[in-house]
């Protein structure tokens, strides 16, 4: 298996710089965006951040946009693989752990935090073996497999919802500051007149079931006093527009909403999936919701997420099945006619909010990192990053190499690379 690490960006630094915090996250926005939120807080405090992700995954496109150095491993998930690939998984994982160890020796992080994703497993195991302080943040109520494993030897286990782990610290999921700063629900919603404003969120990829169920439910209601704003994803935009047109429902269909704070402030009610980040935003904004969990989500984690809001009377949960349009019609009929119920749900959501989650996570990371030495060495590194670094494993010799410019240094196959006197690797 080839193992690669791409340093997407590196700055010229002084001879002695504060060692970074390393973030392990990738695969989906649900893992990446919380990591980016925490990275923003750390960098605002003068703490450098580096990232470890999976080769070719979403994080390789998103993280460099934020000017954060990223290394990647050639690793993928194990769920749903055939028997032959599963039998070879231990070898691939150990190679990935070895490559992750190389990255850690190169970056010399003062602390490592996993938000989940394919690369987080090897990265977390390497951090443990090298003695770097390891923390875990689990966004969902049903923990992912990687964070389940890493939680067993992490120094601190942080969660977005209570009840995910024994001994957890429920700090919440990070949300954008502009969403957390919205006025209280009563200030926005009390006495509001005109059509009821329904915001539909399908996520970055869109949600076909919502594209079909919302127009069908609204036309069955025959409710003219409804204003719909539907975020559907670029790929499903034409489909969503056609569904509303066929139903005779006037809706603003958008592939992407740039200003989510303004969208939440506009809405009287939200219809959406139940991803952890979306629910954190609903609570921070203080808005009631109708939640339709993604039926194929791993371990049905979206239903577990939704149940937390339902238990607080902040949301209504509808299962995704053939009866969804009828049940959605019934729920909307009740909620559209009851502004007091909508306000009550919004207030309940706001009581669940943890708007300072990113700050709290950053505080805990730095508590564990300390201001001095840790298992990875001194608190400062004299490493001089190259403009571009590539790591790969030679398939024939199973050796790990580092290419920096025109120079090539080969490392014999061993558990971890040899550390140079300057803090790099050779």
From Swiss-Prot:
One GO cellular component term: plasma membrane
Keywords tagged on the record: Cell cycle, Cell division, Cell inner membrane, Cell membrane, Cell shape, Cell wall biogenesis/degradation, Glycosyltransferase, Membrane, Peptidoglycan synthesis, Transferase
Taxonomic superkingdom: Bacteria
UniProt: UDP-N-acetyl-alpha-D-glucosamine binding residues: 28-30, 140, 176, 204, 257, 302
Predominant location category: membrane
EC supergroup of this enzyme: transferase
Reactions catalysed according to its record: di-trans,octa-cis-undecaprenyl diphospho-N-acetyl-alpha-D-muramoyl-L-alanyl-D-glutamyl-meso-2,6-diaminopimeloyl-D-alanyl-D-alanine + UDP-N-acetyl-alpha-D-glucosamine = di-trans,octa-cis-undecaprenyl diphospho-[N-acetyl-alpha-D-glucosaminyl-(1->4)]-N-acetyl-alpha-D-muramoyl-L-alanyl-D-glutamyl-meso-2,6-diaminopimeloyl-D-alanyl-D-alanine + UDP + H(+)
Membrane topology: Peripheral membrane protein
UniProt keyword annotation of Cell inner membrane present: yes
Subcellular location: Cell inner membrane
Family matches, as InterPro entries: GlcNAc_MurG, Glyco_trans_28_C, GlycoTrans_28_N
Molecular function in Gene Ontology: UDP-N-acetyl-D-glucosamine:N-acetylmuramoyl-L-alanyl-D-glutamyl-meso-2,6-diaminopimelyl-D-alanyl-D-alanine-diphosphoundecaprenol 4-beta-N-acetylglucosaminlytransferase activity; undecaprenyldiphospho-muramoylpentapeptide beta-N-acetylglucosaminyltransferase activity
Start and end residues of each stretch annotated as Disordered: 369-388
Pfam families: Glyco_tran_28_C, Glyco_transf_28
GO biological process terms held by the UniProt record: carbohydrate metabolic process; cell division; cell wall organization; lipid glycosylation; peptidoglycan biosynthetic process; regulation of cell shape
Pathway the protein acts in: Cell wall biogenesis; peptidoglycan biosynthesis
Database matches in NCBIfam families: murG (TIGR01133)
Task performed by this protein: Cell wall formation. Catalyzes the transfer of a GlcNAc subunit on undecaprenyl-pyrophosphoryl-MurNAc-pentapeptide (lipid intermediate I) to form undecaprenyl-pyrophosphoryl-MurNAc-(pentapeptide)GlcNAc (lipid intermediate II).
Homology family: Belongs to the glycosyltransferase 28 family. MurG subfamily.
HAMAP family registered for this protein in UniProt: MurG
Name used for this protein in its record: UDP-N-acetylglucosamine--N-acetylmuramyl-(pentapeptide) pyrophosphoryl-undecaprenol N-acetylglucosamine transferase
This protein's encoding gene: murG
């Amino acid at each position: 298996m080839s193992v690669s690490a791409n340093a997407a960006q590196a700055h010229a630094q002084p001879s002695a710089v504060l060692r970074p915090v390393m973030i392990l996250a990738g695969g989906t926005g649900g893992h990446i965006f919380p990591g980016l939120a925490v990275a923003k807080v750390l960098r605002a405090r003068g703490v450098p951040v580096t990232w470890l992700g999976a080769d070719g995954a979403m994080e390789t496109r998103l993280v460099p946009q934020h000017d954060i150095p990223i290394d990647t491993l050639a690793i993928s998930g194990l769920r749903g693989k055939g028997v032959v690939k599963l039998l070879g998984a231990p070898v691939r994982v150990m190679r990935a752990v070895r490559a992750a160890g190389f990255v850690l020796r190169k970056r010399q992080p003062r602390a490592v935090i996993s938000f989940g994703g394919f690369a987080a497993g090897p990265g977390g195991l390497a951090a443990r073996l090298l003695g770097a302080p390891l923390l875990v943040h689990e966004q969902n109520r049903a923990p992912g497999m990687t964070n389940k494993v890493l939680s067993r030897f992490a120094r601190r286990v942080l969660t977005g919802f209570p009840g995910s782990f024994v001994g957890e610290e429920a700090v919440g999921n990070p949300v954008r500051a502009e969403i957390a700063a919205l006025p209280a629900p009563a200030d926005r919603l009390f006495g509001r007149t005109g059509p009821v404003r329904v915001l539909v969120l399908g996520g970055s990829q869109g949600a076909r079931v919502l594209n079909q169920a919302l127009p069908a439910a609204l036309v069955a209601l025959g409710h003219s006093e409804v204003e719909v704003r539907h975020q559907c994803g670029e790929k499903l935009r034409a489909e969503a527009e056609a569904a509303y047109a066929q139903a005779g429902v006037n809706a603003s269909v958008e592939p992407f909403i740039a200003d989510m704070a303004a969208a939440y402030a506009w809405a009287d009610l939200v219809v959406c999936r139940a991803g952890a980040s979306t629910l954190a935003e609903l609570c921070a904004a203080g808005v009631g919701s109708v939640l339709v969990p993604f039926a194929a989500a791993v371990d049905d984690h979206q239903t577990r997420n939704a149940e937390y809001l339902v238990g607080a009377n902040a949301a209504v949960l509808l299962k995704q099945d053939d009866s969804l349009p009828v049940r959605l019609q019934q729920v909307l009929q009740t909620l559209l006619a009851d502004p007091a119920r909508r306000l009550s749900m919004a207030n309940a959501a706001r009581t669940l909010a943890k708007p300072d989650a990113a700050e709290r996570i950053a505080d805990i990371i730095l508590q564990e990192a300390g201001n001095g030495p840790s298992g990875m060495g001194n608190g400062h590194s004299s490493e001089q990053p190259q403009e571009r670094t590539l790591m790969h494993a030679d398939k024939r010799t199973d050796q790990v190499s580092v290419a920096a410019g025109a120079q090539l240094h080969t490392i014999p196959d061993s558990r971890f690379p040899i550390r140079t006197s300057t803090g790099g690797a050779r």
